[in-house]
Amino acid sequence: MSTICVYFNFVVYITHTHFHGESNAHTHTIAVKEVEQINHLPLSQSYFKGIQSTPLTNSTIGEYFDFIVDKNPEALAVVVHHQGIRLTYKEFQKEVNQLAMGLLALGVKPGERVGIWSPNNIEWCLTQFATAKIGAIMVCINPAYRPNELQYALNSVECSTLITASNFKGSDYIEMLNCLAPELATCDKDTLNLKALPTLKNIVRIGDEAPPGMHSFNDVINLPTAAHERELKAIGAHLNAEQDINIQFTSGTTGNPKGATLTHKNILNNALFVAESMHFTSNDKLCIPIPLYHCFAMVLGSLLCVSKGAAAIYPGDSFDAKTTLDVVQQEGCTALHGVPTMFISELELSNFNDYDLSTLRTGVMAGSTCPEQVMRKVQTQMNMHQVLIAYGQTECSPINNITETDSSIERQVTTVGRALAHTEVKIIDELGNIQQIGQPGEVCSKGAGIMRCYWNDESKTKATIDDSGWLHSGDLGVMDTEGFVTIVGRIKDMIIRGGENIYPREIEEVLYTYPGIQDAAIFGITDEKYGEEVCAWIQPKEDAVLDEQAVREFLKDKLAYFKMPRHIRFVENYPMTVTGKLQKFKMREQMQEELSDKAFS
C-alpha cells in the first residue's frame, strides 16, 4: 500500500455549503466542542471519530471548477515556470474545455480510461480537468516506468487513450511505445490495433509533432466543432460526484501495482479539507515541485489550488532545489510542498541564506517519515510556521489524520494528528480488537475519503477494505488519550528479535540527533539465532566523516541492548521511489546478499 505521512498543523473545521466558504474562529470553536462530545475525552481505547457536522460537497470536479472560474475569472490560476506559461482562471478554463472537446472528438466516452504519462507541465494540468469534465477516468502513470510497467498499467485498467510526453530524464517514451507496439510505424492513427496494447485506440504526443500512429496534442485541441461543445455541456449535466474519476497506481513492494480507484467526491472533499487546514484563499500561491502523477501533487496541489481559486506554481518538470527556491522568491509563494529529501536539499543549498522566503507560511511535507529536526528547521529557517502535519495513503484520497494549530509544538512535529472530518480512525491488534490507549497496532480508517476499490481486483480490495468498510493501512501506530496518532512503522517493517518487538522509527529518531548524520534507515534482516537482527543504513552529511564505533557508543546510552543495530553501513543514497518513499525491501535484499557472500567467502 502506498503510504504517505503528510505534515499539517491545523485541522479542518468549517461549515460547508454546496460550494465551500471560508473558515472562521466560530466554526473552529464549535468543532472543538463537537470533538469532545462525540469522543468523550480522555480516551481509554484507541478509537477516534472526526467531526460529522460538516456537510460534504456533492459537486463534480468540472462543476466546481466552473464555479471557481465564474467567481474570479481574472485571478491567476497556474504558472508553469519552465514553459513560460501564466494563465488566469478564465484562460485556463478555455484551454481545459478545448482539450475536453478534443478528447470527445477523438471518440473518448465517459467512463473510459485516459492515461497520462508525463512529467509536470501545463498539458498534465489541462488533462486533469479536461478528463473530469467529460467523465473520463484519468490514469496517472509514473514517469519512471519502463516498457513492461507501462504495458501492465495500460492493460490492467484497459486504457483507451494515452497522452504522453516525448521523453523525460533519459527515457525516450516514443521509442518505448514503438518497442511495445512496432505496428505504430505503419498503422493509421485513427484505427489503432496493437497486439501488446489491445484496448488502446488513441496515442496523443504532447507538442506539435505527430509521430507515426500518434496524434499531436496541438492537433487534438484543434479538432472540436460546435457539436462537441454541445456534447460537453450535455455530458457535464449528467455526471455525479459518486462516479470514478481517477486511478492511482499504488507502489507496492511486491507484485504488480494496484489501481486505487477514486471518485470526484473522494478527492474534491479531501482537497477542500486540506485547503481549509492551510487557511488557503484566492490570494495564495502554492509552489508544487513534486510530481503530478502522485496523489500528493494531484489532489493536495493542483486540485487544492482550484478548490480555493488560488494559484498553482510549477517550478520545473522535475525537482531542483535551487530552481524551487528561485521560483518561491520570484513569485512570492505563500506555500511550498515537498518530500523530506526535497526540504533537506533546499536547506543545504550553499546560498540558502541569500533567499528571501518571507512570503512563505505553510505547506505540506509528505512521502516518507520526516526527522523532527528537519521539521523544526522548515518551521524556523524557511518561515513555514504553519507547515502541515497529517497522515494517510493513496487509498484515502489521500488524507485521514491531521493535527491542529493549538496543539503543543511537540505534538505538531511528532504526531500525525487526529481523524479528519467524516473519518474514523482506530488502532487494532492482530485479532482485530481495538487496542488500549498507548498500545501499538495497525492503523485503520473509515470514511468519506476511502477509495471505491482497486480497479478490477475484488480479492485485493477485500483484503484491504473489510466488510465493515474499514481500510487496513498496514501501518503501525499508537493513539494517545486525546486521539492523536503517532506512526511507529510498517507492520512488515517491525523487527522481532528474540521475541522483542522493535520499531525502526524509534531508532531512526535517535540517530537523527547524532552530529554528521543526514538520514537513517532501520530494517530487519534474517538471523538464525534471534529470528531477526537490526540493520542500520546511515547517510552522512556532506563532508562529514562518521565512525561506526563512535555511533555505537552514542547509541549505547540511548537504546535498550536488543535495539542496538547489529550491522551498520554508511551509504551515499537509498533505493527510493520517484516520490521519495524508501524501499526498505531492496535494502534488506542487498544486505542479506552481502552478508551471505561474506559467509561463503
Model-identified regions with their sequence ranges:
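AMP-dependent adenylate-forming
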Residues: N39-Q45, Y64-T88, A210-P211
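Gly/Ser/Thr-rich phosphate-binding loop
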Residues: I221-N222, Q330-G338, L347-R411, E424
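Structural core segment of the AMP-binding/adenylate-forming
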Residues: N24, I30-K33, L106, I134-N222, ...
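Conserved pre-ATP/AMP-binding loop-to-beta segment of ANL
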Residues: P73-L76, A196-L200, V204-P211, H215-F249, ...
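Conserved AMP-binding/adenylate-forming core of the ANL superfamily
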Residues: T57, E74-F129, R146-Q151, S216-T225, ...
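Conserved AMP-binding/adenylation subdomain of ANL enzymes
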Residues: L268-K285, C295-A335, L349
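AMP-binding/adenylate-forming catalytic core of the ANL superfamily
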Residues: Y145-N155, L162-S166, L336, L431, ...
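Conserved AMP-binding A3 loop
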Residues: R86-K90, G236-N269
